[in-house]
Amino acid sequence: VNRMLPLLGFLVVAALFGFGIYWTVQHNPREVPSPLIGKPAPAFSLPQLDQPARHVTRDQLLGKPYVLNVFGSWCAECVHEHPVLMAQAQRLGVPLIGYNYNDAPADATAWLARLGNPYAVVLADETGQTAIDFGVYGAPESFLIDAYGVIRYKHIGVLTPDVINDELLPAIAALPRGTP
């Protein structure tokens, strides 16, 4: 029996390891459902990146659906996503609004000047406070918000052409028509 204990211990560890791998494969952390889906977007008032004296509020954006894209000049994945946004922004059929997260405005402005600006407007959140209200884990993340200000879709990670074609565009097409 004493000689079986090491083997039994090994089998338990191997089983736990195997379960961990299985669970990780089955539960993609990018598919974490947001508790905000179907709920009004949090209230916010954020300065525009290019005109800090001008603030944009959630209520000013009511009446038209839009995609809110969270990015930062410090974000390596955002560099991969950016050419896709440059190429696909017009295809969305709704405004693409940039949400610059935890970033120095000068860095974000230089980043957009270098890579191009696909956004209708860019909001600046240097401290990341509003991001907490949106449940942002990091960048990039994207939200589809309908004309009534309700969050209809959230994507954690890079928006690829496949994600845009297979998820975001169908979500936009499914939005209720009309204005509030």
Question: Where in this protein do the model-derived segments appear?
Answer:
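A short beta-strand-turn-helix
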Residues: F44-V67
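Short gly/ser/thr-rich secondary-structure transition/capping motifs
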Residues: Q26-N28, P47-A53, V122-D125
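Thiol/disulfide oxidoreductase modules built on the thioredoxin-like
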Residues: A113-P118, D125-P176, P180
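Aromatic-flanked redox-active Cys/Sec active sites in thiol-based oxidoreductases
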Residues: N69-C75
